[in-house]
C-alpha cells in the first residue's frame, strides 16, 4: 500500500524574530507554513520570505496574491506572506491538483480503493451519524486526508502483529473491513470547495453527494443517502443574505431613502433627455410600493444636478415674486414634462433662496410641496412648526421672516380665504402651532423622516 509523499513536520524553536508556524521540509530546510489560496498549503523556505506582519499571526498565514501580481501597497505592514515569485512558482508546479471530491470522482487514489482486485476496495468506514448505507461508507467515497491515513496505519500495524480485524476469505484476504471514524469530524470547508489543506487536513473529506448542509452553512453537517431521498443532494454553499441588502437598508433609513413611495412624491427627480427637456416619467421597481426614476438611480440625479443642469424642482422651492421668503407650492396637477426654460427659472428662484437641505417634504396625504414658509394666514410665520400632514412636523428657516398674510398654497396676494389647509380646516382660521426657537434648531435638522413617526415636540431629525 502506497502512501502520498506529504511534508514531514517537526517542532522547531522559533527564531528571535518571533516567527511562528515554522517547520522542516524533507531536505531539512527551515520553512514557513503558508496557505496558498490558488493551490494548497505550501512550505516556503524562510530565506525566501520577506518580513511582514504575517509572521506575528497566531493562525496560519496566507500568501498575498496582490504581492504576486505586483499590486500590494502595504509593504511590511501587510498581514499576508510576501515570498519570492520564482520560489512560489516552483512550489506551485510541484502541486498536482487539489482534491475535488473523493477518489470515486477524480481524486487521486492513493490506496487503490477503486481496484476491485485489491482488498482495499472492500474497506468501509463507519460514520455513526450517516444514513448512507446504514452508516458504512466505502473507502472510495473518501478523499485521502490525515484521519484516513491514521486509521490505515493502525490497521496495518494490527495485521502485521497477527491480530484479526475482520473475517477473511479462502485466500486470506478480508471479506469486509470496517474502519471506525467516530472520533473524527467532517470538513466543512471541503464541502464548500474552500479547503486548501488537501491531504494534510485533519478532518474527513467525504463525497459531496453524501454530505448535505442541513443548517445552511452553520457548520453542522449531516450525512444522508441520495438514493433514499430520491433527489439531488442539497446545496453545498451557505445561504446567507447579501451584504448589499443590509447596506441598502441602512441607506434607506439614514437620510433620504433609496426609493420613494409613489404617494410621497408625485413628481420624481428630473432627468435630462437628449431633446433638452426634463422627463418626469417613472418606472416601477420590483417593490410594488416604490418607483424609481426612469433610466438611472437617484444618485445619478444628484450627480447630474451638480453639472450644467437645472436643480431638482422637488427639492428646490419656487419662491413667489415679491415674497422671497414664501415658497410656492407644487400641486399634484403638475404636468408630466417641463421645459428647460422653466427649469432655469427654478434655478434662478432657488438661487434667491437658500440650500435645499433646509427643506423637508411631507410623507403623504397632501400635495408634494409642504415647504412651509412665512405665512400668517394658514400657518404662522417663519421658524414655526407645521403639523397638518398626518402629524408630520415640518418647517422652514429661510431667514426672511414673515412677509404678510400670504398662504403658501397661492402665489402672491391671490390667497383665498375659502380653501382648505392640508389638515382640513379653513385658511381663515389660524392653526395653533408650537413655536420653535431658531437658535435651537440647526439647518441640518430638517431632514427626511423615514420612520413615519414624529416624536412629540414637533421636529424630526
Curated annotation (Swiss-Prot):
Motif annotated as MKT1-binding motif, chain positions: 446-451
Q: Which domain of life is it from?
A: Eukaryota
> Per the UniProt entry, what is one GO biological process?
regulation of translation
Could you list this entry's UniProt keywords, alphabetically sorted.
Answer: Metal-binding, Repeat, RNA-binding, Translation regulation, Zinc, Zinc-finger
Any one Gene Ontology cellular component term annotated for this protein: cytoplasm
Instruction: State the deletion phenotype.
Output: RNAi-mediated knockdown in procyclic form does not affect growth rate. Simultaneous knockdown of ZC3H20 and ZC3H21 in the procyclic form results in a severe population growth defect and a shift towards the bloodstream form transcriptome. Simultaneous knockdown of ZC3H20 and ZC3H21 in the bloodstream form is lethal.
Region entry Disordered, spans: 224-243
InterPro entries assigned to the protein according to its UniProt record, in alphabetical order? RNA-bd_mRNA_stabilization_reg, Znf_CCCH
ZnF region ranges: C3H1-type: 63-85, 181-208
Which one of the record's GO molecular function terms can you name? Answer: RNA binding
Which signals induce this protein?
Induced during the differentiation of the bloodstream form to the procyclic form.
Provide the function of this protein. Answer: RNA-binding protein involved in regulation of mRNA stability. Promotes mRNA stabilization by recruiting MKT1 and PBP1. Stabilizes transcripts encoding mitochondrial proteins.
Q: What is this protein called?
A: RNA-binding protein ZCH321
Organism of origin is Trypanosoma brucei brucei (strain 927/4 GUTat10.1)
The beginning of the lineage is: Eukaryota, Discoba, Euglenozoa, Kinetoplastea, Metakinetoplastina
Amino acid at each position: 500500500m502506497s502512501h502520498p509523499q506529504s511534508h514531514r513536520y517537526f517542532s522547531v524553536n522559533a527564531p528571535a524574530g518571533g516567527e511562528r508556524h515554522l517547520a522542516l521540509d524533507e531536505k531539512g530546510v527551515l520553512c514557513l507554513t503558508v496557505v496558498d489560496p490558488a493551490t494548497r498549503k505550501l512550505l516556503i523556505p524562510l530565506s525566501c520570505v520577506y518580513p511582514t506582519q504575517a509572521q506575528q499571526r497566531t493562525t496560519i498565514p496566507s500568501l498575498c496574491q496582490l504581492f504576486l501580481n505586483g499590486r500590494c501597497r502595504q509593504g511590511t505592514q501587510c498581514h499576508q506572506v510576501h515570498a519570492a515569485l520564482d520560489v512560489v512558482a516552483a512550489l506551485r508546479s510541484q502541486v498536482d491538483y487539489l482534491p475535488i471530491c473523493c477518489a470515486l470522482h477524480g481524486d487521486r487514489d492513493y490506496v487503490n480503493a477503486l481496484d476491485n482486485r485489491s482488498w482495499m476496495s472492500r474497506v468501509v468506514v463507519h460514520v455513526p451519524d450517516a444514513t448512507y448505507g446504514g452508516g458504512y461508507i466505502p473507502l472510495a467515497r473518501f478523499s485521502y486526508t490525515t484521519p484516513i491515513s491514521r486509521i490505515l496505519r493502525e490497521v496495518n500495524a494490527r495485521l502485521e502483529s497477527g491480530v484479526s480485524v475482520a473475517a477473511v476469505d479462502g485466500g486470506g484476504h478480508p471479506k469486509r473491513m470496517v474502519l471506525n471514524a467516530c472520533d473524527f469530524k467532517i470538513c466543512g470547508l471541503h464541502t464548500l470547495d474552500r479547503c486548501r489543506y488537501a491531504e494534510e487536513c485533519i478532518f474527513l473529506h467525504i463525497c459531496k453527494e453524501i454530505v448535505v448542509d442541513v443548517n445552511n452553512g452553520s457548520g453542522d453537517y449531516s450525512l444522508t443517502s441520495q438514493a433514499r431521498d430520491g433527489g439531488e443532494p442539497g446545496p453545498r454553499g451557505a445561504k446567507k443574505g447579501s451584504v448589499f441588502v443590509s447596506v441598502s437598508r441602512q441607506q434607506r433609513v439614514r437620510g433620504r431613502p433609496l426609493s420613494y413611495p409613489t404617494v410621497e412624491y408625485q413628481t420624481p427627480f428630473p432627468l435630462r433627455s437628449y431633446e433638452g427637456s426634463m422627463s418626469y416619467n417613472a418606472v416601477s421597481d420590483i417593490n410594488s410600493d416604490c418607483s424609481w426614476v426612469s433610466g438611472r438611480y437617484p444618485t445619478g440625479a444628484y450627480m447630474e444636478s451638480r453639472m450644467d443642469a437645472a436643480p431638482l424642482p422637488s427639492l428646490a422651492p419656487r419662491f413667489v415674486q415679491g415674497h422671497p421668503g414664501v415658497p410656492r407650492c407644487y400641486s399634484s396637477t403638475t404636468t408630466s414634462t417641463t421645459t428647460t426654460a422653466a427649469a432655469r427659472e427654478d434655478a434662478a428662484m432657488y438661487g434667491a433662496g437658500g440650500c435645499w437641505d433646509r427643506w423637508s417634504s411631507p410623507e403623504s396625504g397632501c400635495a408634494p410641496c409642504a415647504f412651509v414658509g412665512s405665512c400668517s394666514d394658514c400657518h404662522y410665520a417663519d421658524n414655526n412648526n407645521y403639523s397638518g400632514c398626518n402629524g408630520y412636523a415640518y418647517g422652514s428657516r429661510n431667514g426672511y421672516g414673515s412677509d404678510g398674510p400670504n398662504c403658501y398654497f397661492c402665489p402672491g396676494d391671490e390667497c383665498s380665504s375659502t380653501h382648505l389647509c392640508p389638515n382640513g380646516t379653513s385658511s381663515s382660521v389660524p392653526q395653533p402651532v408650537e413655536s420653535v426657537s431658531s437658535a435651537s434648531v440647526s439647518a441640518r435638522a430638517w431632514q427626511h423622516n423615514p420612520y413615519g413617526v414624529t416624536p412629540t415636540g414637533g421636529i424630526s431629525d
